[in-house]
Amino acid sequence: KGHFIEVKRDDLVGEYQGHTAVKTKEVLNKALGGVLFIDEVYSLRNGAGDDFGMEAINTIVPFIEDNRQNMIVVIAGYSQPMNEFLSTNPGLKSRFNTTIDFEDYNTDELYEIFKGVSKDFNWNETTTKKIKDYLSNMIMNKDENFGNARDVRKFFENIKKHQINRLVEYSDLVDN
């Protein structure tokens, strides 16, 4: 098959007792023969009272052990929450024993991403410098939740929102 399935907590956790195991097994069975990617997997464990999330974890662990020759499971998230997540079940660390830490992008790389998401816009030299300065400042002030390309996309969406607001204000002036 060689297919790819990406899921999050909502795709695995049910709405009532017993529903989570069924829902999780459906996803796991669909992933057989392919790759299952669970983004922000630590969201399955939202605290000590999260029985539904724990039910999903307890369904995943034996399933991937029994089917390790027929699927690849990749879990992703920020480093610290991932380490905490891997401690929630004794079988997790041994089943996910390869870790890849991606370095954050530098200013030039973030600017290339910005150019990609804003390809339909033209930026003059002054604006380009301001954008690069903003991206550089974003890196200098980042915290453990820094979103790299996601933060660049959000930055661009914010620029578009402000542009739309200015155009609306301008059209109000012209109409009057």
What are these language model-derived features?
Residues 2-31:
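Short glycine-rich substrate-engagement loop in P-loop NTPases that contacts/grips substrate
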Residues 42-93:
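Conserved catalytic/switch belt of AAA+ P-loop NTPases
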Residues 147-169:
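C-terminal helical "lid" of AAA+/P-loop NTPase domains
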